[in-house]
Amino acid sequence: MSLAFDPTDDFADVADFQQDVTLLRPGTSDSWALAHAVRAVVRVSEARASGGDVTEDDVVWHLDAAEWDGSPQPGDVIVQSDARRWTILAARLTATGRWRCVCRDLAIAQGLDQYVDVEVAISTKDPAGAESVTWHPWRTGVPARIQPVRSTVEDDYQRRTVSSELKIYVADQLPLDETHRIRAPDGTTYRVVGCRNAERIDALMEIDVVEERD
């Protein structure tokens, strides 16, 4: 990825001038309101072979360095007024006094059109020493897409059960393990069995889950 400053490349194809954005630093409460951000034209490509279902949009944002005394870092998120989020992949300060930020917005073509809640298991003991596990909200309202992978039918002691495996795509990078589960809008819960791209800032996080059944 080239970060060389090219005024023609950076400003000849700008899509918007001096719009308000918010810069967020994931994992912290830090945020900065910036009023003079400039965005170039969005470049859309397919993130992987998916028939167009998974796309990645790349763009260059220019942030006025005079607006705050910090500096953008890879992994920071630029949020537009319409709530569209852009993850910064790389940033450099140019001779014009603006931060040139190469950003990406990974999106499912149909949209991350569901909002799921992530719950965490809390283990406690009663006065008699018996252990019990209860589930508590950990992260709510996470934009996601739930994608079925496969279903397996099993006969267990004359009882037929169906085991459903799914993938859940989220834009947020969440530190998940087996102590977490995901609750869908219809109340269905999914046990987390694995995840990918949790350490990458340039890809959607993929969560492998199994539907919980009584």
Placement of each model-derived feature along the sequence:
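Active-site-proximal polar cores
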Residues: 1-35, 109-132
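Short, conserved turn/kink motifs that form compact alpha/beta structural patches or helix kinks used as
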Residues: 22-111, 130-214
